[in-house]
Amino acid sequence: MASSNFIDYVKVCCRSGKGGAGAVHFRKEKHTPLGGPDGGNGGRGGHIILRGNVQLWTLLHLKYTKHIMAEDGERGGTNRASGAQGKDQIVEVPLGTIARDPETGEKIAEITEDGQEIILIPAGRGGLGNEQFKTSTNQAPHYAQPGEPGIEAWVILELKVLADVGLVGFPNAGKSTLLSKVSAAKPEIADYAFTTLAPNLGVVKYRDYRSFIMADIPGIIEGAAEGKGLGIRFLRHIERNSILLFLIAADSKDIRAEYEILLNELQKYNPELLHKDRILAISKSDMLDDELKAELKKELPKGVETVFFSSYLNQGLTELKDLLWTTMNKPKSDFME
């Protein structure tokens, strides 16, 4: 997914349809030129509706859409006929999309399932026709209700990538290479920092036709929570991942220190992230023999599953997938220290 095509934040002005006016009408029959009231009700306007679409990964299709409008309802007819309803405006969004009020930041709606629909902006109701106002004391009402106006409001749509596993690490930790090895995703890979400028998603095939989603989140650096590097823009995507897979290269100067920096950035951004299951994966492990791995394990944090792998030699990838799958499907327990 090219970074220029990955849009995870848009602000749009939405206007639901206004309701149609009720009709003022009286029956006109051959032998009853001035019959009773038969004005129909107006039709409701169209809603603005969010719909989840599993085929979408970005809000790119809404980037240049500043106004979203639904149809107005039609006025009531004669012979008690109701006016037609305005057509709803369906806005398809990726799973993980949240709608917020731009003034308060309050969450209005959240889409997490394919085909899920939520009315984002409700339509105006149609007005009642004069037939509805007939009473024993007023057999010929000459008035009807106007339709309710539609609602116009600015809305922020924010995407938080839904994935089972989120890759967390410094730039150049080998996250994109790993994703390309265990899935069909083709992220850009190069020997310089911030190659990944937007989250990349890949479907990891597992045993017996099972699979899970892995997300390569752009590299985190110290100070990311304060906006350094690519800043907090992409940290929010980690919030939707079930497991955080920390990737640190075997040739790092201090693996434990890097791990602690990454944890600290997540803690500063959102302490709830530390309640998620996490696994520490040491990449480029072809540089280490068994003795070095054993020594290294002694220095690493206790209580955190650690796995060594090499994308270059395809070593340890099966074990890594096994560990991810097992962790993903175990009963939830207290968070790790």
From Swiss-Prot:
Compartment(s): Cytoplasm
Any Pfam family: GTP1_OBG
Keywords from the UniProt entry: Cytoplasm, GTP-binding, Hydrolase, Magnesium, Metal-binding, Nucleotide-binding
Alphabetical GO biological process terms: ribosome biogenesis
Positions of the OBG-type G domain: 163-329
GO molecular function ontology, one term from the record: GTPase activity
Annotated EC: 3.6.5.-
Binding site for Mg(2+): S176, T196
Main location: cytoplasm
Protein family per UniProt: Belongs to the TRAFAC class OBG-HflX-like GTPase superfamily. OBG GTPase family.
Protein task: An essential GTPase which binds GTP, GDP and possibly (p)ppGpp with moderate affinity, with high nucleotide exchange rates and a fairly low GTP hydrolysis rate. Plays a role in control of the cell cycle, stress response, ribosome biogenesis and in those bacteria that undergo differentiation, in morphogenesis control.
PANTHER family: DEVELOPMENTALLY REGULATED GTP-BINDING PROTEIN-RELATED, MITOCHONDRIAL RIBOSOME-ASSOCIATED GTPASE 2
Subunit structure: Monomer.
Name of this protein: GTPase Obg
Naturally occurring in which organism (per UniProt): Cytophaga hutchinsonii (strain ATCC 33406 / DSM 1761 / CIP 103989 / NBRC 15051 / NCIMB 9469 / D465)
The gene coding this protein: obg
